[in-house]
Amino acid sequence: MEDNEFDELIDDWFIESLKTYRDLYVYQLEFPTRVIEWTSGKTICVTGYNKSSKNEILELSLPQKLFAEEKKGLCAERDFKVLHGGFSPDPVGVLKHIPGTRLIVTNDELTSDLQVWNLGGDDSDIITKVSSVQGSAGSPGGVKMAARISPQPEVLHGSRGGDVRLTQLTTGQTLYQLASTCEERLTSLHFVSNAVFLAACANGDILTVDTRTSSPPQLAPAPSTPDSDMWWTDVSGRGGLIRVSSSGWAAVSDPRSPASIARQARLAAGAPHREPHHVNVLWAPALDDIVAVSGFSGAVQIYDTSSWQSEPRDSHPLFEHRGHAVCSQRGEGGAVAVNCLLWHPKETRTLVSAAVDASLHVWDWIHRSDAR
């Protein structure tokens, strides 16, 4: 693409963004990140993924202007700010913040071992490693994790359906070991209560596990759809489970009965990126029936699932964030993949997204009905 054409494309998109975003902040990291994780309502953690060098772990504060209720024009802080930082000798492909603490847990996606880090506090700006957790013997890399508020910090982790365990981080003690022969790779883990969690498999199966019993997990098979080689899953605190397949099929269930499909659709998402870890499917925590999907193109798509029915029909996005795709046109003549995505836990329509070109965007989108 010629420079003049690229400049016109950027100008057109920014003019359009004045009508479609309440807020939009564009930031360039020094390194691409595969993870974004909230450490508070105004701070995120990002990390590098370079197999041949040390990788930064950074805690960033979001622009204060984003959270200014009134007179945003008078708010001086309009940029991201590094609060704490450290280095990992290994790439970081998975990261989980432990709620109620200053601890994060990381995995390099090469082994199943975990590294535990302290993010620091007011008296120190250094992120330091405090301990390690050895993974299951023979377990592959690419650990998935889930965390919950508990008296002692703990994390649920595993790579396959048969090697999931709950570990207390202060002692390294295994609090629970899943009794299952399932060898399917996991795409995510989700607590649905203090005692029950769901293990989502790459083939679309869902394992429901009650940690209070030694009974084997309940298996809910994948939806029956054509050409769906891989599935990604999310569970909403508002009571919905969604599975999206590599062919663009989406199915919504009640987490208490994941085998029963309540409604489904065919998404206008296109083909997924060649790297499965780039795909993200996330319910909006502060909105009913709204889900964000990324990794199928250079855009983040927002869908309203409330209109979906028991029989699948084509569904078109309510909103698309094309900022990463537009801004990447100069580099390689094509869009880059969005490889991580996060909704704000309380701000209704605010998301953070990052792409493989190291771009980091924070954006608050406007619903079409609000723009009239």
Predicted regions and their residues:
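Blade-level signature of beta-propeller repeat domains, shared across WD40, Kelch, NHL, RCC1
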Residues: 338-372
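Beta-propeller domains
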Residues: 1-27, 37, 41-85, 107-134, ...
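Loop/turn-rich, solvent-exposed surfaces of beta-rich toroidal or solenoidal domains
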Residues: 274-312
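Canonical WD40 repeat/beta-propeller blade segments in eukaryotic WD-repeat proteins
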Residues: 31-38, 90-97, 136-149, 181-192, ...
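Elongated alpha-helical scaffolds
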Residues: 89-109
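Amphipathic alpha-helical protein-protein interaction segments
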Residues: 22-29, 50, 81-88, 157, ...
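Per-blade loop-tip surfaces of WD-repeat and WD-like beta-propellers in eukaryotic adaptors/scaffolds
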Residues: 63-74, 113-131, 152, 159-186, ...
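Structural hallmark of WD40 beta-propellers
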Residues: 42-46, 101-106, 150-157, 194-199, ...
